[in-house]
């Protein structure tokens, strides 16, 4: 099955500039969390459009493979939170059903729908939800991750690492697989995970904006780019930058943006 409306053998975007490396060199850099998911229903066209208009050059995307093989932009494993009154599990529900559901400002989007319309200078911070936060051993979830890797490789002309930043969490072991594919990896951490974390396995380190100065000092000492999450107003942004964050994962495009 082709994941894109284009011929699967034809790259959507040719390999070119390393957009990810250039993006991470900015101070500060901004990533739109869940495509503006606090101001707008998460992962919808409204939030995507608002994020791009606000000047974001990176979008954070959670994806899950649905029953018919498409990767759907959704954080949760089922639809009950984002579409009240429904209870579809993403993994065993086909896109033909999911596409009929409506959140407050529109329907769900597939990863292909997003890639088809974003400019070539946009970084996609992709979180493959079933493998990003644990030592996943389920063959189906690992196969879905492999399918996603292959799709991105074709879509971005053999060099997806130039457009995609791979997102994981402290307990996720997918970083090794992503690094083997050439990706830079961003890990989102919480204060109680810092002491036991090996920063060397990641390229970008995320932390709650409200974490104490001692926590941020440890992150900054790594010499790696850092990103504060989840920012929804100017006060939080200022505090995060004062603690040394080099990037902001912001979720309210009209208030916090580049």
Which sequence ranges carry the predicted segments?
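Phosphate-group recognition and catalysis centered on beta-loop-alpha active-site segments
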Residues: 1-258
């Amino acid at each position: 099955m082709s994941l894109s409306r284009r011929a699967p053998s034809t790259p959507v975007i040719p390999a070119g500039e390393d957009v990810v490396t250039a993006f991470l060199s900015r101070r500060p850099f901004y990533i739109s969390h869940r495509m503006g998911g606090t101001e707008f229903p998460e992962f919808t066209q409204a939030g995507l459009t608002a994020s791009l208009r606000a000047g974001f050059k990176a979008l954070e995307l959670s994806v899950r493979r649905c029953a018919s093989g498409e990767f759907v932009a959704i954080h949760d494993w089922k639809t009950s939170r984002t579409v009240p009154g429904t209870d579809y599990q993403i993994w065993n529900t086909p896109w033909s059903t999911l596409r009929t559901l409506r959140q407050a400002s529109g329907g769900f989007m597939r990863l292909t729908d997003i890639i088809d319309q974003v400019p070539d200078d946009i970084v996609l911070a992709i979180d493959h939800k079933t493998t990003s936060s644990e030592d996943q051993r389920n063959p189906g979830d690992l196969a879905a991750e492999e399918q996603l890797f292959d799709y991105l490789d074709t879509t971005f002309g053999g060099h997806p690492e130039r457009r995609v930043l791979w997102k994981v969490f402290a307990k996720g072991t997918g970083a090794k697989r992503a690094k083997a594919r050439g990706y830079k990896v961003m890990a989102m951490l919480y204060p109680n995970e810092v002491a036991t974390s090996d920063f060397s396995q990641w390229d970008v380190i995320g932390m709650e904006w409200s974490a104490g100065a001692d926590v941020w000092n440890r992150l900054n000492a790594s010499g790696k780019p850092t990103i504060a999450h989840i920012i929804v107003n100017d006060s939080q942004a200022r505090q995060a930058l004062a603690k040394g964050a080099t990037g902001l994962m912001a979720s309210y495009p009209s208030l916090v943006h580049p």
